[in-house]
């Protein structure tokens, strides 16, 4: 729990246990060291990966992503989630990590082979799959002949980029916002926008536009010096208001589809929002609206009577990657290590309110997996650790 739920590193967990042991007057007798904790995590994670705790045999969907990388290594992960909408946006407790493998690159054929191996352990194919718009993943889904939902967040961001990325007004505004970084050491630093990301910029456009809208709405409250430096904001008021309205509409549609499930009813509500909020707007808004409508119609075609409400977001796997990044080695040449085996444990220990007694389960995990099993798994699924090779060569 200290590592998986609280986010402690094995070193930090060792110190926490030592403090607790001292405060509780030696109740633990002897607290484990960080290497022991790391070994326990690897054994438990491997057992969880190979012996799923949840029963999703009847119907499941698969979420895949290979967007996390360290150096020249890419990690491909497959998540198993309920095929039917769970009544809420997916959480870690709804998921099972069913496959992980590291490679230098992931072509469509390699992804297909990976998925074939994963599916063979599950008994039958998923009812549908969800992934981002990576060409390799899309092609792999075609080769596998799976129903394939394009993740709603990534796809909507792609549409926004298609409409605005090369638009002269947007390019000018984005450049002017970027130039405000020279104010970082001035008395106006408190008014600076958040840093614009170079990767997935259009997925993270909301904070920048929210900032622009806030400056615009409060421009009259700025002093003369501040107005001078941010005078480009009212000059671009039309574009800022347009983006703010469009992104609000997009966010509302995504909230419906994520929190209430993707269904014919959700599509109808999304279409209504688009027609009311975006169709009356400027040419760019109408172009974006058409792309959104086409997406909703195409994805609705993948729904079927038996499972009429689908999950359509891969946010949960992005959250999983976020938890992994917190425990990754800081040295890039180390690549991916056995620390990735902590990810399967998150579905068990993600909810502190869960009163389930996992002690017997964890005990079984530790007894069922050995260090030898972990070593074998690393040889099959991870690439050689170049940091170890460096130490050997330069010893």
Language-model regions, residue ranges each:
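Short, amphipathic alpha-helical "recognition" segments used to contact nucleic acids or chromatin
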Residues: 1-11
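RNase H-like nuclease fold core
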Residues: 25-129, 135, 139-154, 162, ...
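Acidic/histidine-rich catalytic cores and adjacent linkers
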Residues: 131-143, 179-395
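Short, solvent-exposed positions on alpha-helices
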Residues: 11, 35, 334-335
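RNase H-like two-metal-ion nuclease catalytic core shared by retroviral integrases
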Residues: 153-178, 314-319
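Glycine- and acidic
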Residues: 1-3, 22-25, 95-100, 302-306, ...
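DNA-recognition alpha helix
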Residues: 11-27
């Amino acid at each position: 729990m200290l590592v998986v739920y609280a986010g402690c590193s094995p070193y930090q967990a060792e110190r926490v246990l030592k403090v607790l042991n001292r405060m509780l007057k030696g109740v633990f007798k002897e607290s484990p060291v960080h290497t022991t904790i790391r070994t326990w995590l690897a054994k438990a994670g491997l057992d969880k990966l190979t012996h799923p705790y949840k029963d999703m045999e009847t119907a499941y969907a698969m979420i895949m992503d290979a967007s996390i990388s360290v150096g020249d290594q890419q990690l491909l992960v497959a998540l198993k989630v309920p095929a039917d909408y769970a009544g809420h946006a997916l959480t870690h407790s709804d998921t099972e990590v069913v496959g992980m493998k590291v490679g230098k690159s992931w072509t469509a054929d390699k992804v297909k082979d990976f998925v074939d191996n994963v599916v063979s352990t599950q008994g039958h194919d998923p009812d549908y799959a969800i992934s981002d718009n990576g060409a390799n993943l899309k092609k792999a889904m075609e080769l596998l002949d799976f129903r394939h939902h394009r993740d709603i967040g990534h796809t909507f961001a792609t549409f926004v980029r298609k409409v605005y990325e090369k638009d002269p007004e947007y390019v000018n505004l984005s450049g002017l916002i970027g130039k405000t970084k020279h104010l970082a050491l001035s008395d106006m630093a408190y008014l600076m926008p958040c840093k614009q990301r170079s990767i997935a910029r259009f997925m993270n456009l909301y904070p920048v536009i929210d900032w622009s809208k806030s400056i615009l709405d409060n421009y009259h409250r700025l002093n003369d010096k501040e107005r001078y430096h941010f005078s480009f904001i009212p000059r671009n008021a039309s574009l800022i208001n347009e983006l703010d309205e469009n992104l609000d509409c997009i966010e509302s549609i995504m909230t419906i589809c994520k929190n209430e499930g993707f269904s014919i009813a959700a599509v109808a509500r999304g279409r209504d929002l688009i027609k009311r909020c975006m169709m009356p707007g400027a040419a760019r808004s109408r172009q974006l609206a058409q792309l959104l409508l086409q997406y909703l119609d195409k994805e609705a075609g993948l729904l079927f009577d038996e499972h009429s409400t689908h999950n359509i977001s891969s946010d949960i796997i992005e959250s999983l990657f976020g938890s992994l990044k917190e425990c990754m080695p800081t040295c890039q040449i180390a690549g991916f290590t056995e620390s990735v085996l902590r990810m399967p444990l998150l579905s068990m220990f993600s909810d502190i309110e869960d009163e389930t007694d996992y002690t017997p389960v964890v005990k079984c995990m530790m007894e069922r997996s050995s260090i030898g099993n972990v070593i074998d798994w690393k040889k099959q699924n991870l690439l050689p650790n170049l940091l170890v090779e460096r130490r050997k060569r330069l010893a």
